[in-house]
Each structure stands twice: as structure tokens, then as C-alpha cells.
Amino acid sequence: MPGVLAMILAGGEGTRLQPLTITRSKPAVPFGGSYRLIDFVLNNFVNSNILRIFVLTQFKSQSLYMHIKNGWTVNGIPGCFIDQLPAQMRMGKRWYDGTADAIYQNLTFIKHNDPEHICVFGSDHVYKMDIRQMLEYHKANNAELTVSAIRVPIDKAKAFGVIQVNKKGRMIGFEEKPKNPKHIPGDPEHALVSMGNYIFKADILYRELERDANNENSSHDFGMDIIPALYPKHKVYVYDFLTNKIPNEKNVGYWRDVGTLDAYWSTNMDLLTNKNLTLNNKSWALHTYYPPLPPATFLNYRNKQVSIAQSNISAGCEIVGAKIDKSIIGFNCKIGPGTEISESIILGEAKIGKNCIIKRAILDKYVEIAPGVVIGEDLEADKSRFTISPNGIVVVPKGAKIGFE
């Protein structure tokens, strides 16, 4: 799409997702068996025919770098690219210092592409969005900044930027992560919050970033600094995510922030139980890096019948005489006879021995489980070995070898 440049903020450290983010950045965390979190925003841009994309990386970016390098390319299409921009200290000996500073440090690359409109989007939310529709709304209002927004329960709003709008959709109030969020007029149970997706007129963004960079008291963050400075004096409009339409899908406002282990687990489970999150819409294909693996194999073993119910099983898996229920199994996992896995996420490359029990757990990549190990039945016992989320999800770190002592 001419005149439009996408900037994806993908430097998130994701401390609340540890141990899943010990060796990778938050956008690189695997999701749904075959994807990574960043795939959702990349698909939103590509499916919207916005094919000039910069991905800004910083923390533990090697896993993310390889995923994008291997799985995302628009080579051969003139003027189109998906390029990664790691922190390069172009503005002095410092890393990206806030979301706004990350864009500011890359103004040279942005201006070289001479865009009229610049999309600044996050990379760690699960949702589908035709960004062209938000862009049309932005242009129709001659907005200098447009912020996408969604309704959330009032008790959850304090984790987001809370917005007030007038009847024409113009922003008239904004508070970043307030202690006492303001509800939507006439709806005391909900607040309108920012999704962290912005479309700027290029000249406005340049000017505001320069102003912010020279403010020693700024945290250089879009939510904390840029938006509060803009909306009182400039045309800042709010795009209602509920109006967005994806072909062959009904939009009920499915959008998830997977910033915690419990949110990550429940959003993965939505793939199995929530019809509002689907991966098989051919009209809105979800691309990713797909390794060259054979189809999954399911084998009975003596008197042990393999059983798979309400689960997603990825390529390369070999499941022998095991029972899998309400679970997501990533690439190339080997699961032995007599093992029972339920309400769990196995991120890939796991080796799980025979007669194991795994319940309500997340196993990171390259985990090896000895025969007979039980995980998730006794949380008190599990606390001495693993991370336990507030809702009782057991998390086994990458590369762990369990039960071989």
C-alpha cells in the first residue's frame, strides 16, 4: 500500500512471562503449536497489503531474528520489505529507552522511505485486524493520530491506557494505567482502552518525537508521554476495534494481551474451546515459519490405544499409545505409551517418556521427561521444582530434564 510504513515494536522483554522469556523476547514466544506471538501482527499487516515493514528488536532477539528470517519474506516485490532493526545506538551509547525512543532512534530509516502515514503497532497481542479499515478511518477524519481501542471490564482496565471520546470519536481524555479507570458513559461495567496500535501522520510523528527526545523528564513512551501531549491540541481520533471486519469471520472483539503466564495459557486454550479465535480461515491466512517436518504420527502400543481429543498436534510429532486431551503439542514432540496429557501446552521438541501424567502445564522447548513423572497433580510438590502461576499452571523451563536424577 503506497504511502504507508509499518513499525512493529518487538523489543519487549516479557518479564512476567518468565521462564518462557529467559532465552527469548516476548514476541518470539511460541503460540498455538505452530506460531509465535509476533505472527499475528505480521499477518495483520501482510493480509492488509501493507508490505513495507520494519520490526524493531532489542532483548534476546536471536530466536525472533531467525523466525522472521526463515519465515517472513517479500523478496522480489519491488518496494516491499520486512526488515529487522535492532538497537544500534545511533543516538548515542544507549539502547532503546521506551517505545517512542525506539521509533525516534530509527527516524533515518523511516524518512528514507518517505511515508505519508506511519503505523506503530505492538507485537505481543493475539487478534486479527484489517489495518486498511483503521487507515481509512484515520484518513476520513483527517486525523493526526488514530488510536485503536477496545472495551474491557472495568476491573481489568487499570493495566491499559484508558480513553474518553466524544460523540464524533475524537479523544478528549487519556490516562495510562490509572488506579481508578473511568468507565464508558452509560456503561459502568466497562472502560475503553488503547490496544497499543497507532497510525500517525508522518510529519506529526517526526515533530512529536523530536520534542519528546529533548524532554529530560519524559519516559519516552507513547502511552505515558506522546498521546497525553497530543490529544488536547491535535486531531486525535479513536478507532473502535469492534467495527473491524475480517472476511468470513464475525468480529466479537477478540483481542488478548498475553503478558502473564495465566493469560498465555488461557489464550492458547481458546484455540480449542473458543470459536472466536480460529486459525483456519482461508480468507485470512495465518503465515508462519513452518519447518520441513513430516505429518504427525499416531500409533497404538500393545494394549494402549492412542487417544487425541480437542487438541492441536503439530507436524513431526510421534505419539505412541498416549492420551492427549485439550492440549496443544508443538513441533516434533515424542510422547510415550501410557502417558496422559491434559489442558497443557508443549512448545515443541519435547521427549516425554511412558506412563507420565501432565496436567495444566506449560513445557518449554527441548524438555525431556523421564518415564513415570507426574506434573500438575500436586502443586505443593511442584513448587520446589517449577514456576507455578497464580492460577496453578505449572511451567517447566526450556531444556529441563525431569526425573532422571
Which residues fall in each region the model found?
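Active-site acidic Asp-centered loop
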Residues: 121-123
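Short aromatic/hydrophobic "clamp" motif used to bind/position activated sugar donors
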Residues: 118
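Conserved core of the sugar-phosphate nucleotidyltransferase
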Residues: 128-203, 207-210
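N-terminal glycine-rich phosphate-binding loop and ensuing alpha1 helix
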Residues: 1-73, 77-80, 90-92, 137
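Active-site-proximal specificity loops/subdomain of glycosyltransferases
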Residues: 79-103
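Left-handed beta-helix
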Residues: 1-5, 203, 211-405
